[in-house]
Amino acid sequence: DVPTFWSQAAQQGFKPKIVTIGKALLFPSVVDSLGARGNGLTSEIWWTPNHPFKSGLTGQSCQALADAYTKATKRPWTQPIGYQHALFEVAIDVLKHTKNPNDPKSVLAAITSTNYQSIVGPVNWTGKPVKNVSKTPLVAGQWQRKDGKFHLVIAENKTAPNIPVGGKLLPLS
């Protein structure tokens, strides 16, 4: 697991200039468990409260969804929240556009014709760029410690320039 690897890497004197870790850095609790060595780790970012999208179902902005989650659970937002919400958005949209919800072919036709603006951005299964695949925007981020807490900061948005950058990429500390 990442905490064990990162701890042992430090013990061995391994000090790379940059480290990118995917799924293991989704949650602030994992980064917190790394202590000071978590500062500066990078990861791809799928969704944050700063993304410019809104729910086609509820009209909520990304920030409003994250705030509602934090208020209801007393826990910080995490990237999967946007996708969990989008899952329901898209499912409801598909049902709205299905001619006969009891007919699998009708449901499939509604899915493959989906072109929906969701809280994670456009969900489009109409065949572009690849049939039955919908790509959502990814940006690069970095965990940066501020005021004693780790924050996931968008540091690069070249592949999705409509998503605002929140800070510069800093060297590992």
Regions found by a protein language model. Give the residues of each.
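Short acidic (Asp/Glu) and glycine-rich catalytic loops that position anionic groups and cofactors
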Residues: 45-46, 88-89, 117
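Intrinsically disordered, low-complexity boundary segments flanking structured domains
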Residues: 27-34, 110, 125-129
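Extracellular/periplasmic ligand-binding modules, especially the Venus flytrap/periplasmic-binding
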Residues: 1-9, 50-113
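Acidic/polar loop patches that form or flank catalytic/metal-binding clefts of enzymes
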Residues: 16-20, 102-105, 118-120
